Amino acid sequence: MGFRRNFRRVLRKWKVIVYAVSFILLLQAFFTFQSSPNLIEEEHLKRIKELQIRKHQELAQKMLQGERSLVDGKIFLNPHDPGFREQFFKHANDSINILEDHDVGKVAKMEKLPSKLKPHNFEEIQFEAETKIPSIVKYQPKCEITLKDSLSALSRATSDACKQQIADTACKMQDNTLFPESMPRTCPHENKFKFDAPMPATFDPDLRPVRICYMLVVHGRAVRQLRRLLKVIYHRNHYYYIHVDKRSDYLLREIIKETEQYPNIKVAPWRMATIWGGSSLLRTLLRAISDVLKIWKDWDFFINLSALDFPIEKDEKLVQYLTKYRDKNFMKSHGREDDKFIRKQGLNRVFVECDTHMWRLGERTLPKGIIVNGGSDWVALNRRLCDYAVFGNDQLLVQLKHWYEYTLLPAESFFHTLVQNSDMCESFVDNNLRVTNWNRARGCKCQYKHIVDWCGCSPNDFYPADLVRLHTSRPVFFARKFEESINQEVVNHLDFKLHGEYPPGTPGLHSLWENALRVNEKIPPNCDLHVASVLQVEMYKKDEEFSGYVVTFDAGWLKAGESEEVIDGSARVQLQALLSHQPTLRMLDRTSALSKRLESASVGTNWDIKELVLRDWGGLIGPNSDLHLVARWSRSDDDFVVTVVVIDPVNVVADYNDFRTPSKAAGVTETPLSLKKPLRPGRWVVRFYVQRQFTNICAELDFYVTPLEFKDGAEGDSQLREINRGVVDDAQLNAASRNLYSIRTTLNLPHNNLAATELANQAVHVDGAKLRRWVDAVASGAYKAKDACLVAQATETWREAQPRRCYTPRQITPNLCENLNWSSMSPDPKSEMIPVKPDGRIR
């Protein structure tokens, strides 16, 4: 009874709560029942999902089985159904929600595709497990590449287009579809034919003299040497077609100006960036031949020269010789066994040119039925051969052009092989009419390995001691190479020998000027060197004078194709630069007493009153710096009062001061500048007057306030906006609250509203490239990079790091730092730690 009575008492007390809980449970059960799907509907949804998944899997399997081909730059993964890709994309878009459902089967998550997919936006589809997942990759190999050289090339190539070209070529190599197995030969001779063309004892005066079309392939900056070559080979009966390398803008502008007056000299309106050994060299030659065939109708021979060639015989003798053999073609063949030549020349290898590099992809078999011949790419071709090489379309020519598109040094054997296997083989003369100065011990150092996967050779420059090589048993009319910047005497010797010496006293005969820099010259895109990180800054003094800062830094070239400043991690070098402080003191009235006594002046921070020096070495000033004007005076019996006026970047007087020069002694004066902070960034000016004679400015001194890029070591602080703008109110510029009205009225300086607006616009940026450019622009007013050097053991470090797209012929490589006196890498015996000597000392 007691238990029952207690239970009723508790039930009465908690009755309301029990009813409430029961009601909530009933509501929850009701809504759960209402929201649950009908079993039939649930089964129907499940079947729809399974059907869609199965359809997608079948489609994926078809994709895997489909072939891949490249048609008009678009990739179709199943050539049997050109609309298959669009069908796949549409189905994929419709099935996105199902493919992302992790509760259904083993469907992997697929990255959501754009709503409107176009074939050329899609590069590759990859699948994983049973259900393959489409994904975008950088380039699309059409096969599994196994060739070792091709894999190496792919790992080193940078652009997607280049990788695709390498991969496509490698796949064709692997399935033996890149080259024909054989080519036709129409030469009536079984072996190579060579016609002997000696120098005739006499010439027939009744023969029509031949007219020559010279093609000059030039690059670099030696415009004076090119002008000199044109001068000695020029004749009004000949024609001259000049191709200027795409990277030689200065040379192009100069040569266009120089040749305007000559109707028989044309500069090619197109330009290629040719590289040593590249297939682009042959394309350049063939395109030039096509041009000159259309431009001029009456030339007989095509001769290619470079700016480093020079004639060793007069033009009249060359014309007579070619007139005698007007139906011949002059090419120098190799002087060794064919097999050895083919191996050394790399003709049994496949090469592809892209990214300004010749990539070796693997071995190949030479085509059957023809004789492969070659030697030098400097030739003299008659018009008939030129017309055939450009406009012919027979099987031999078409297949040879294709074969040489994948050949190293194609210009050195294309014309040789074409002639030897055509019906013009009897026109082949084994002589290219020139002498080349070979010194293989010095010229074969694999110096082109940074642009070609091969070790090549290059001829040497002629010196006077090499002139004996010009005497040969065969007829020769040109020699190479000559560089006046290396030796001008040998060029003078040949010039004077052919055309006589200039009159005595002619100026400039033994002088040379060669352009090194031209303002506003274009450079290859993304080929500026950018600072990656500053490693060290050292103050440098010479003969007790501050000479600047030596900055050690890592630098690199930007990645190809990047719109932002993204430095390629593999294209870096370590450099040192000497940043020299610009002289900023100008004496405007040299007759004044002030100009006669003032030796130097500077504005800076960290004034050392004990040593009477500014210890910030070079005046590195920011918006929050406390500034001091320090002047050094020579001895004089007279002293006087100096008035200095400080003018800010918007041409507003910010401070003035009076002080007396040292009396009857040399000395230093220091004047604190009372300027309200933050200082306005930009160029400030201090004017020197004698005893407030404001009509006569005796001297001016510039100093620069640099905006801040960091605050408390961090970028992007919003306070930088206010700091870098400086004091906004002109009335608040002076920290000492001096009344500047009188002096401002006296000087009557116009307010620079444009500078004020520019300052406000620049101060908006608290981080990013625009702020950095502003900092650099202001700092460059105070400092200039006087010199730079390479921190390395050898200059090859520069070439190995430099991107191939930035390579330019005859480019300037920085000096090694250890060879420059200003560099901290140069020897310093007085402070070098050495092993202990026998006397126990290291000094």
Swiss-Prot record:
GO terms for cellular component: endoplasmic reticulum membrane; Golgi membrane. GO terms for biological process: chondroitin sulfate proteoglycan biosynthetic process; heparan sulfate proteoglycan biosynthetic process. The chain crosses the membrane at residues 15-35. It is an enzyme of class 2 (transferase). It comes from the Eukaryota. GO terms for molecular function: metal ion binding; protein xylosyltransferase activity. Pfam families: Branch (PF02485), Xylo_C (PF12529). InterPro entries: Glyco_trans_14, XYLT, XylT_C. It is found in: Endoplasmic reticulum membrane; Golgi apparatus membrane. Keywords: Disulfide bond, Endoplasmic reticulum, Glycoprotein, Glycosyltransferase, Golgi apparatus, Membrane, Metal-binding, Signal-anchor, Transferase, Transmembrane, Transmembrane helix. Residues 1-14 are cytoplasmic. It catalyses: UDP-alpha-D-xylose + L-seryl-[protein] = 3-O-(beta-D-xylosyl)-L-seryl-[protein] + UDP + H(+). Catalyzes the first step in biosynthesis of glycosaminoglycan. Transfers D-xylose from UDP-D-xylose to specific serine residues of the core protein. Initial enzyme in the biosynthesis of chondroitin sulfate and dermatan sulfate proteoglycans in fibroblasts and chondrocytes. This is Xylosyltransferase. The gene is xt.
